[in-house]
Amino acid sequence: MLHVSMVGCGAIGQGVLELLKSDPDLCFDTVIVPEHGMDRARAAIAPFAPRTRVMTRLPAQADRPDLLVECAGHDALREHVVPALEQGIDCLVVSVGALSEPGLAERLEAAARRGHAQMQLLSGAIGAIDALAAARVGGLDAVVYTGRKPPRAWKGTPAERQFDLDALDRTTVIFEGKASDAALLFPKNANVAATLALAGLGMERTHVRLLADPTIDENIHHVEARGAFGGFELIMRGKPLAANPKTSALTVFSVVRALGNRAHAVSI
């Protein structure tokens, strides 16, 4: 059985716990949240994981997990993932956009090397990451990502200061530029852009367009890649989580799949 600690108990974390509540190969020992969120977390996980402890940090060495899953946002990488890696605990990371922060990727890699652990960046809401990473081996010429979401998904971002999102009546470009800038300006919306960049041409050479489209109620991801392998084009239409329109439901499923690959006898 794989013993897991999870950082975060928001829409993604709760979705993961619900889908895996009956998996005999997985045990969620702890959920890690800030102190002010402990009571809310206990109430949220009670229907799915009544025996899971709610804590503010990793358990003591004797009770440490086999694996840490980060579902809490960018600050969690510094606060929880770095020390877990240093202790030799493998980590699964959802908030891939955080690695655009200067120096953080290097800090995480150094922690993993010191602890002889591994950090796996999850594909989240996007597909074809395996193909893109394989294509990089032979050489990539261009990777272009276009993310199209309903206006409400851009609330709480710099786009809300630039545009009246409730009044948009046509598709509006809210950002165009490098993946590194997209991830810094739209950290809660740019995990896909960062994941594609890290799998492919890097943060500085991956071109990103982010659109607010009032005619849709789903998150649409469009990826074009060209290189020595040839080329591919991917379109994904992902339903957002009801509890968080900034996040695709597929993100939850990608965490579930990654955990299954770690815990089960056969993986794909």
Swiss-Prot record:
Reaction(s) catalysed by this chain, per the record, are: L-aspartate + NADP(+) + H2O = oxaloacetate + NH4(+) + NADPH + H(+); L-aspartate + NAD(+) + H2O = oxaloacetate + NH4(+) + NADH + H(+)
Enzyme Commission number, as recorded:
1.4.1.21
Could you tell me one molecular function GO term of this UniProt entry?
Answer: oxidoreductase activity, acting on the CH-NH2 group of donors, NAD or NADP as acceptor
NAD is among the record's keywords: yes
The UniProt entry's sequence similarity note says:
Belongs to the L-aspartate dehydrogenase family.
Q: In which pathway does it act?
A: Cofactor biosynthesis; NAD(+) biosynthesis; iminoaspartate from L-aspartate (dehydrogenase route): step 1/1
Q: Which HAMAP family does this one have? A: NadX
Binding positions (NAD(+)): 125, 191
Q: Which Gene3D superfamilies match?
A: Dihydrodipicolinate Reductase, domain 2, NAD(P)-binding Rossmann-like Domain
Extra information: The iminoaspartate product is unstable in aqueous solution and can decompose to oxaloacetate and ammonia.
Which InterPro entries does this chain map to?
Asp/hSer_DH_NAD-bd, Asp_DH, Asp_DH_prok, L-Asp_DH, NAD(P)-bd_dom_sf
Q: Where is the active site?
A: 221
Signal peptide boundaries: none
A Gene Ontology biological process in which this protein takes part is: NAD biosynthetic process
Role, per record: Specifically catalyzes the NAD or NADP-dependent dehydrogenation of L-aspartate to iminoaspartate.
Q: Which enzyme class, named as a word?
A: oxidoreductase
Q: Which UniProt keywords apply?
A: NAD, NADP, Oxidoreductase, Plasmid, Pyridine nucleotide biosynthesis
The name under which this protein is listed is L-aspartate dehydrogenase
